[in-house]
Amino acid sequence: MVIEELTLEEKIGQLFMIELDEKGIDDKTIEMIQKYKIGGSILYSKNYQSYEEMVRMINQLKEINQVNKIPLWIAIDQEGGRVNRMPKEVVPLKNAFDIAKTKDIELVKKSGQVMGKMLKETGINMNFAPVLDIKRFKDIHAIGNRCYGENVQEVETYGIEVMKQIQKQGIVSVIKHFPGHGRTKKDSHFFLPTIRTRQEELEETDVHPFQRAIQEGADAIMVGHIKVKKMDEKYPASLSEKIVGQKLRTDWNYKGLVVTDDIKML
């Protein structure tokens, strides 16, 4: 099945990914999948109480989607550390920064392999990880220890390796938060962070890991709800034609999937 074979309504549906109700799959979920042909669903730990319940829910979503032409994206935020959406039976990985600061590339690879395998075994096919932002502040904040390093080289070496290991398990790895969330302490879940750094400097630092990841085969990229004034004076990155249309699609010739961060945050 190729996109050209879909109806207009089906193409529109593919643009959306929904969050399940806290109680799980309900009539509204079924309607969104079967009537509106949505592209996928993201799971949170609030949606299940056990590993068995999680797997059962994933299988139900796939069964509900059988009437559609394209498989459902079943996604999760599984970074390790404080961003852990797996049930309590699954031992969580350490956070990205602690793993990367060992400078043990084999350990980094192993963390990506384990992450990918645990998701594959559940039936999940998309992971919103790794974070390719650069850690710039010592204290814990919105991004902090979710990063793989404090400079471009560390983030590219360790973050992109994790991306590759997730991919090797057949999971789509969504790198985030383009064009870089590391220069602000503000949490984009609650505020619209504004970055005023010169574009030339951003291109050499925060933006660079994303370009490198694309060159090395990134499947998908998440665009953050971040206002980068020197790249687009008016719109946040997630709504910016200059950042998505011009930078990603035209300048970098990126053909992969582009996803926004959660629209509820806007």
Feature roles, as predicted:
Residues 53-63, 105-121:
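Active-site-adjacent structural elements in enzyme catalytic domains
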Residues 86-91, 125-145, 176-193, 224:
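Active-site-proximal loop/short-helix segments
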Residues 90-103, 147-149:
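A charged helix-plus-loop insertion that forms the helical arch/lid used to bind
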Residues 7, 19, 25, 47-66, ...:
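Second-shell residues forming the walls of enzyme active-site clefts
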Residues 1-38:
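N-terminal basic, low-complexity leaders that serve as flexible interaction/assembly modules and, when applicable
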